[in-house]
Amino acid sequence: MRKISFVLLLALIALSSIPIAFADEVDFSNSATSACVMDKDSGRVLYAKNEDYKLPMASTTKIITAIVAIENANLDNEITITKDCVGIEGSSVYLKEGERWIIRDLLYGLMLRSGNDCAVALAKAVSGNIEQFVSRMNSFVKDLGCTNTNLTNPHGLHNDNHYTTAYDLAKICCYALQNNIFSQIVSSKKYSTNIDGVTKVFVNKNKLLYSWENCDGIKTGYTKKAGRCFVGSASENDRQFVCVVLNDGPMFEDCRKLISSCLAKYKYTFVIPTNKLFVDYVDSKRMVYKISKGFYLPICVDDRIHVETDFDNRLVKVFVNDELFDTISISLINQ
């Protein structure tokens, strides 16, 4: 097998289209039992604290409920609210039996007002009953590789077998934010709709949306056993970071601090530029390969980036601090 490897240190910074100015001081102190900050595009973990602890997640469960519903339902379909969707314990938009709701409106009630009744109505609309919908939710998270997450309901009310980790939840959110409909919903400060002639106004419970211009999502949560939970997202210079804090009293303050510190510490850098050429020689024949889409990562001043080409399998392997991070396909363009 023919392989060529090389190490890219801080010289890589010159390849970036973004000016690099690493921060001298960042503050990662926080009160969370578990926390994780992740880059949405690459999935790189930028900060972690007990990120693999299995913990209750409260209403951050609804992130999964929302993306599963978005991917499996016609959002313009109208449903009639049934008796078993009314009077659900906890936060609610106060659905009434017989009301006619568009699925899209239920999603806003779910994510902005954290309606447990909306979660039940969506589960029934998508899968016919709660059990089948929860099964679909569990299949969804397992397909993403989130093996430390298990769900028993669509709303997050406490159950000892209902849990996630900060890492899993960050990974789920990075996936969900790739969906434009999901992103639009969770970044909305307010949403109005008309239900059977009555105007409903949903105001988002995510306080960071009002106090921090970088914030663009996602979801709050609270139960006595889970404590205060929050998943926040923020963007700057085409970077979007996701932060999960579980059982964290000052959840908004800690989330903003953690994301701000990561935005200061890490800068997007092209590890491999778009249309980068790789040359190999086989029996004196010159073989030229190209990567069609550049590969970039948030990196900090201490990172070691190692790139290895595997021409036999037409792959480029990217190592971050000596651990394999990703593999990228390359194409032969001449022979």
What are these regions (language model features)?
Residues 146-147, 158-335:
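Domain-terminus/edge residues, biased toward the C-terminal soluble/receptor-binding domains
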